[in-house]
Amino acid sequence: MSIHIAAQQGEIADKILLPGDPLRAKFIAENFLDDAVCFNEVRNMFGYTGTYKGHCVSVMGTGMGMPSISIYARELIVDYGVKKLIRVGTAGSLNEEVHVRELVLAQAAATNSNIVRNDWPQYDFPQIASFDLLDKAYHIAKKLGMTTHVGNVLSSDVFYSNYFEKNIELGKWGVKAVEMEAAALYYLAAQYHVDALAIMTISDSLVNPDEDTTAEERQNTFTDMMKVGLETLIAE
C-alpha cells in the first residue's frame, strides 16, 4: 500500500491508463477490460486491473490538476513499479483547426505552474512525451481513421483564468489545446525514467465557443482516446 492507493504489490499492472475522472476509469474497466478487479477506492479514486486483448493493464483516476496527478503518478511509479503511463482526458482547443471530439497527442507541455521551477529555478526544463508512445499512438490513431493532432499543449494551474486572452494567444504559436495535467506527468516520467504520454479529446473550444459537449458525454463517450491509449500500451 501507498499513502493514497490501497493496492497490494502485484495488483497493479506495469502499464496504466490515467483518466482524470474516476468514473471514467470505472467506465473503461467495465467496457474495455476483461475480468477487471477494483484495487483502489480510497477517496473514491477508483482503480482497476484487468486484461485487454490478453495483456494485463490497469486504469485509475487521478483527479483534476497537476498536484493531484503528481501524487497518484508518483506513487504508481515509485511504490508499484508502473513503467508506462498514458493520460486520457479532455482539453479545450486553442487552435481554430482543432475541433471538438478530435484527438490531441501532447508532444510537449508548456505550463504556467511552478511545479518544475520549484526544482529548477534557473532552467526552463522542457516537459516532453515518450517518443516511443507518441509514435505508436499516432500511427494507431491514423490506422483507426481518427482525426488526430500532434503538438504542444498548455498545462494550466488555473481553470477559471483571469488571463483568458493570453491562453488563446498561445494558439497562434501552434499550441493545440489547454488542459491541467500533462506537464506534471511528463516531469515525473523524466525524473523516474519511465514512459508517459497524454492523449486528449477536445471537449470544448476557446476559439470556437459554439463547439461544446455535455458532462455526460465527457464521462461516458470519448472512447476513441481510450482505444488508442489501450492499443498503445500493448503495442510491441
Swiss-Prot record:
Biological role stated in the UniProt entry: Catalyzes the reversible phosphorolytic breakdown of the N-glycosidic bond in the beta-(deoxy)ribonucleoside molecules, with the formation of the corresponding free purine bases and pentose-1-phosphate.
Alphabetical list of Pfam families matching this protein: PNP_UDP_1
Active site, per annotation: 204
Keyword Transferase annotated: yes
Primary gene name: deoD
Residues annotated as site: Important for catalytic activity: 218
Quaternary structure (record): Homohexamer; trimer of homodimers.
Protein name listed in UniProt: Purine nucleoside phosphorylase DeoD-type
Keyword entries, A-Z: Glycosyltransferase, Transferase
Gene3D superfamilies: Nucleoside phosphorylase domain
Family: Belongs to the PNP/UDP phosphorylase family.
Residue sites binding phosphate per the record: 20, 24, 43, 87-90
UniProt GO cellular component terms: cytosol
GO BP terms in the entry: purine nucleoside catabolic process
Reaction(s) catalysed by this chain's protein: a purine D-ribonucleoside + phosphate = a purine nucleobase + alpha-D-ribose 1-phosphate; a purine 2'-deoxy-D-ribonucleoside + phosphate = a purine nucleobase + 2-deoxy-alpha-D-ribose 1-phosphate
Organism of derivation: Streptococcus pneumoniae (strain CGSP14)
Record GO terms (molecular function): purine-nucleoside phosphorylase activity
EC number: 2.4.2.1
Residues engaged in binding a purine D-ribonucleoside: 4, 179-181, 203-204
EC category name: transferase
Coiled-coil region list: none
